[in-house]
Amino acid sequence: MKELVVLSSESHTLDGCDRVMLSGDQVIVQGKPGNRADLPGVRVPDDEVLSTVSVRVFLEAARALEQRLGQQ
């Protein structure tokens, strides 16, 4: 297994994810079970704590979030 690189650590809200870690070409998302993620591409299933998404999907979600925050 490749070394995990922590990209983000955010625990201030109940929505979204707590930890985002990069492992090769996959992003591992640690979230709060049962809560809705801010973006569907990084949603963690209700009965799981860890989920993976491709780097491409994660970057698309991050860019969409940046655009949304820039419009506020």
Name every feature range the model reports, one short phrase each:
Residues 1-17:
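Short, charged/polar N-terminal "headpieces" of proteins
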Residues 5-8, 23, 70:
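Compositionally biased amphipathic helical and low-complexity segments enriched in hydrophobic
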Residues 13-52:
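A short, structured beta-strand/loop element
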Residues 42-72:
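Mixed-charge, Lys/Arg-enriched low-complexity segments
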